[in-house]
Amino acid sequence: KKQRRVAYAASFASFIKQASSHEDEFLPWLKLFDSVSVREQDGVEYVKSKGINCELTLDPTILLDKEDYEPICAERKIKDKYVLMFGWNTNTDLVEAAKMVSARLGLPVYNIVPPPRKMFCGIPRRLDVGPCEFLSMIKNAEFVVTNSFHGTAFSTTFEKPFVSVVTGKADTRMYSLLDQLGLSDHLVTKDQINIDKMLVTDFSCVRERKSALRKTSLNFLQNSLKGL
């Protein structure tokens, strides 16, 4: 019996341009799927250009509200107010942006990005951060400075003031997510950061947009799994 194959919220991340040089390897397998959705708009367009139906859906972590995550957040370990720096890599722009926010708010910065040592560029790094601590660090931050998709996603989930710092080639998932949520102005270079504007983000509008996007994403899943 043929098994149903569903790809939910897959992603090309920042590698959409490289996909064309590997089509012989992955397209035959992709065509075996009954339903396909991805997280970025240019990914939707690319997959559709290959004759495969594709929809734009939310990352699965965004299908939940902050109330769903709060029970698994670790106990707060940093009692004072702080700025959080988190990214998928460490670069000068991210560090400078974090220090800029720190100076503006008069708060210390804590770092949970590589490399794994206690201090990096004068910023202390938390070495005791697993998934539950990660959620807690974002939830309790006064401001989040990130260049990571999931740093961005969870900042919107916990409705924190944040900035997603772009350096060269950005993750297209971040572009698509923030565009859908009406937060494109949070994706900037370090020289474009408007801290005062980020501090007064209207998350009520973001909640409304998320609610509609969740319905679309859940409809995709329900339709894809119908009859099983």
PLM regions: where:
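Active-site anion-handling motifs in enzyme catalytic cores
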Residues: K1-L228
